[in-house]
Curated annotation (Swiss-Prot):
Its main location: membrane. Residues 151-164 have a biased composition (Polar residues). This is E3 ubiquitin-protein ligase Itchy. The WW domains mediate interaction with PPxY motif-containing proteins. Residues 356-432 are annotated as: Required for interaction with FYN. Residues 535-544 are annotated as: MAP kinase docking site. Monomer. Part of a ternary complex composed of SMAD3, ITCH/AIP4 and NEDD9/HEF1; within the complex NEDD9/HEF1 interacts (via N-terminus) with ITCH/AIP4 (via WW domains); the complex mediates ubiquitination and proteasomal degradation of NEDD9/HEF1. Interacts (via WW domains) with OCNL. Interacts (via WW domains) with NOTCH1. Interacts (via WW domains) JUN. Interacts with JUNB; the interaction promotes ITCH-mediated ubiquitination and degradation of JUNB. Interacts with FYN; the interaction phosphorylates ITCH on Tyr-381 decreasing binding of JUNB. (Microbial infection) Interacts with Epstein-Barr virus LMP2A. It comes from Mus musculus. Its EC number is 2.3.2.26. The modification N-acetylserine is found at S2.
Length: 864
């Protein structure tokens, strides 16, 4: 009994806490050839449940931080260093780990850690024998008296056995997610040290902190559920020092007196007297605990909480339920929670923070849907104006049909052509068919187009150009229908598809992406293929889904990926205006150090959409389409981007600025991320005054600057990727609005056109299920119609010709409704064939419920 006092005093000295400053200097990491851009490493330091992180260094294998981190340690603590690589769109990757024993480091440095620089070897997480690099750190601010070492080595060796593997493995059963011990493990270890016979005798005050400790300690993580929480958990108080460790004992004599240091909020070394429990920490007054909860203190002085209702413990202080929530118990004794506002239930206990985050997510989702709906409406008028000419029956831009040909319309409203000379019919227009099936040019010849769309021919052998076609000997200037042909939009599309077929490569490529990391997976795969491979047929695979890609999966991939890459939240693009939800390049995209690589990737992706005839979810501004077409932008293009700035330039153009006394110079200011910079429109423009004579030049230059300010590098990177897949000259006979429709499709859903061009299998137009279906389509709003269209066809965009020109895996494929299944089945879709499997429901309400559930909740491919 006489030896117990000194032993406990010695352990109190060894468990006394002090600050340690760790300066993470630099690292030398092993290169990974699979990572093109290099890792973005940062260091996480964990010790005794604490976790501190450094800033990240972008794209380097030799990072330098020189960042100080302060932690609370004891002489028996063990530091764990983890080097992570930050990932933008997925979880961070662990590059290597290293451990450091403070006790051994103190012994090797004369019990003082004052600016001690150490180089630690990083090892792999899965293979500890693999060297991943070196990490340099500096330790400072810790000092221990020498008598602690001479008298306390045995206690140190015993007490440090708790965390020997805490750094080598991430799933240690005795260490929680951030390194803190469970309450039962801590209690068991403390009893062994306090009551064991091998505890050495130490003098008081052996461990002295060289710096004042921190005023508070971060809360420990949630422990495992204890074996018993009814009342005070049972503990074994035998003389051999064993303990059950189910929970920290609560029937011990706890000294609740506070010293002068405790009142100031400092951490006090634990004083154990006669086997009694530790002194609890002086906690700040908080809100009362919910009913059924109790606050306790374990033998390390750590506060934990007991839920007597659910019979569990946790380190986190419980919060009361948010307003409107109620806790209930079902017939099997399971606890669930009821939200009386939304009339929903959940197994997970809600918190104020989780409810607030959910409400914020709902608000952002509704705002995004509203923005997209406004964007969709923007294209309705444009399409009507675009096709006004093609709907004029008195004017045919292709000219008259060849002799012996006749144009007819079938019962479904589709146009076909009759050749009375050979008595055959065909869908293709003979005027465009002959132009698409021309003979190949001689070797060394190339056909190009002027700005007006007139074809001319380049003889690379003699380095000459001519309008005369070397195949026919006729001049392209004399071919009137050819010029009219390139001015008709539908014919332009056919001609463009013809050239895409000429550039296409045989076979196909597989693109495997997951929905959770769609952006990053698509970026890695598209940039890993050569441009020629990306011209092959695309075979998109979503792992875990049974869909076979006959065109429908690729359509959804383009739709989903375009929604991701063009999201303004990534700071690569921004909305063109407050009320204009078209996109343009964000001048502040440089805050992402890899933004030029992403713009090259987006250029490839947009060109792939045009090349493969797929649609994207979001469109660009008209000036950006002009840049794709290599057409100049001017003052008129500024009106759709910045109306206020446009009106001010119009005022300058129409008024005498000299009479108004305006002092303007050939210099403008721009603000990016709060920083204002001056830009000269011409050399020494800050000293050149704008006058009536040169204001036209000023207006032209300032309009060009406004449309291209700060995005020159991004635009160049975009076109580098774009031209690798599809050279821009193949688009030069389109205008900006036509290119917009070609890339995004038509936005207006014509119900009459939809119903007129639908076909049925095992149903008829008069079947009650079909009549109910069209009644349902008429009742829902425009947004749900688009979702229904996306559910069946894979995209909410329509081709140029509307529902009559819907394409499937085998060519033209109309919207089809087939009678399949039983009345208790959900509708299924076959996006590759534009087919909806509609079971024979018994009532309209049942059909409406099943269809709404299908289009709202279904995601992925599970079709045959």
């Amino acid at each position: 009994m006489s030896d117990s006092g000194p032993q406990l005093d010695s352990m109190g000295s060894l468990t006394m806490k002090s600050q340690l400053q760790i300066t993470v200097i630099s690292a030398k990491l092993k290169e990974n050839k699979k990572n093109w851009f290099g890792p973005s490493p940062y260091v996480e330091v964990t010790v005794d449940g604490q976790s501190k992180k450094t800033e990240k260094c972008n794209n380097t294998n030799s990072p330098k931080w020189k960042q100080p981190l302060t932690v609370i340690v004891t002489p028996t603590s063990k530091l764990c260093f983890r080097v992570w690589s930050h990932q933008t769109l997925k979880s961070d990757v662990l590059l290597g780990t290293a451990g450091l024993d403070i006790y051994e480091t103190l012994k090797s440095n004369n019990m003082k850690l004052e600016e001690v620089v150490m180089t630690l070897q990083l090892v792999g997480d899965k293979e500890p024998t693999e060297t991943m690099g070196d990490l340099s750190v500096c330790l400072d601010g810790l000092q221990v008296e020498a008598e602690v070492v001479t008298n306390g080595e045995t206690s140190c060796s015993e007490s440090t056995t708790q965390n020997d593997d805490g750094c080598r493995t991430r799933d240690d059963t005795r260490v929680s997610t951030n390194g803190s011990e469970d309450p039962e493990v801590a209690a068991s270890g403390e009893n062994k040290r306090a009551n064991g016979n091998n505890s050495p005798s130490l003098s008081n005050g052996g461990f002295k902190p060289s710096r004042p400790p921190r005023p508070s300690r971060p809360p420990p993580p949630t422990p495992r559920r204890p074996a018993s929480v009814n009342g005070s958990p049972s503990t074994n108080s035998d003389s051999d020092g064993s303990s059950t460790g189910s929970l920290p004992p609560t029937n011990t004599n706890v000294n609740t007196s506070t010293s002068e240091g405790a009142t100031s909020g400092l951490i006090i070394p634990l004083t154990i007297s006669g086997g009694s429990g530790p002194r609890p920490l002086n906690t700040v007054s908080q809100a009362p605990l919910p009913p059924g909860w109790e606050q306790r203190v374990d033998q390390h002085g750590r506060v934990y909480y007991v839920d007597h209702v659910e019979k569990r413990t946790t380190w986190d202080r419980p919060e009361p339920l948010p307003p409107g929530w109620e806790r209930r118990v079902d017939n099997m004794g399971r606890i669930y929670y009821v939200d009386h506002f939304t009339r929903t239930t959940t197994w997970q206990r809600p918190t104020l923070e989780s409810v607030r985050n959910y409400e914020q997510w709902q608000l952002q989702r509704s705002q995004l849907q509203g923005a997209m709906q406004q964007f969709n409406q923007r294209f309705i008028y444009g399409n009507q104006d675009l096709f006004a000419t093609s709907q004029n029956k008195e004017f045919d831009p292709l000219g008259p049909l060849p002799p012996g040909w006749e144009k007819r319309t079938d019962s479904n409203g589709r146009v076909y052509f009759v050749n009375h000379n050979t008595r055959i019919t065909q869908w293709e227009d003979p005027r465009s068919q002959g132009q698409l099936n021309e003979k190949p040019l001689p070797e060394g010849w190339e056909m190009r187009f002027t700005v007006d769309g007139i074809p001319y021919f380049v003889d690379h052998n003699r380095r000459a150009t001519t309008y005369i076609d070397p195949r026919t000997g006729k001049s392209a200037l004399d071919n009137g229908p050819q010029i009219a042909y390139v001015r008709d939009f539908k014919a332009k599309v056919q001609y463009f598809r013809f050239w895409c077929q000429q550039l296409a490569m045989p076979q196909h490529i597989k693109i495997t992406v997951t929905r959770k990391t769609l952006f990053e997976d698509s970026f890695q795969q598209i940039m890993s293929f050569s441009p020629q491979d990306l011209r092959r047929r695309l075979w998109v695979i979503f792992p875990g889904e049974e869909g076979l890609d006959y065109g429908g999966v690729a359509r959804e991939w383009f739709f989903l990926l375009s929604h991701e890459v063009l999201n303004p939240m990534y700071c690569l693009f921004e909305y063109a205006g407050k009320d204009n939800y078209c996109l343009q390049i964000n001048p502040a995209s440089y805050i992402n150090p890899d933004h030029l690589k992403y713009f090259r990737f987006i250029g490839r992706f947009i060109a792939m959409a045009l090349f493969h005839g797929k649609f994207i979810d979001t469109g660009f501004s008209l000036p950006f389409y002009k840049r794709i077409l290599n057409k100049p932008v001017g003052l008129k293009d500024l009106e759709s981007i910045d109306p206020e700035f446009y009106n001010s330039l119009i005022w300058v153009k129409e008024n005498n600025i000299e009479e108004c006394g305006l002092e303007m110079y050939f210099s403008v200011d721009k603000e990016i991320l709060g920083e204002i910079k001056s830009h000269d429109l011409k050399p020494n423009g800050g000293n050149i005054l704008v006058t009536e004579e040169n204001k036209e030049e000023y207006i032209r230059m300032v309009a060009e600057w406004r449309l291209s300010r700060g995005v020159e590098e991004q635009t160049q990177a975009f076109f580098e990727g774009f031209n690798e897949i599809l050279p821009q000259q193949y688009l030069q006979y389109f205008d900006a609005k036509e290119l917009e429709v070609l890339l995004c499709g038509m936005q207006e859903i014509d119900l009459n056109d939809w119903q007129r061009h639908a076909i049925y299998r095992h149903y008829t137009r008069t079947s009650k299920q079909i009549m109910w279906f069209w009644q349902f389509v008429k009742e829902i709003d425009n947004e749900k119609r688009m979702r229904l269209l996306q559910f069946v066809t894979g995209t909410c965009r329509l081709p140029v010709g509307g529902f009559a020109d819907l394409m499937g895996s085998n060519g033209p494929q109309k919207f089809c409704i087939e009678k399949v299944g039983k009345e208790n089945w959900l509708p299924r879709s076959h996006t590759c064939f534009n087919r909806l499997d509609l079971p024979p429901y018994k009532s309209y309400e049942q059909l409406k419920e099943k269809l709404l559930f299908a289009i709202e909740e279904t995601e992925g491919f599970g079709q045959e």
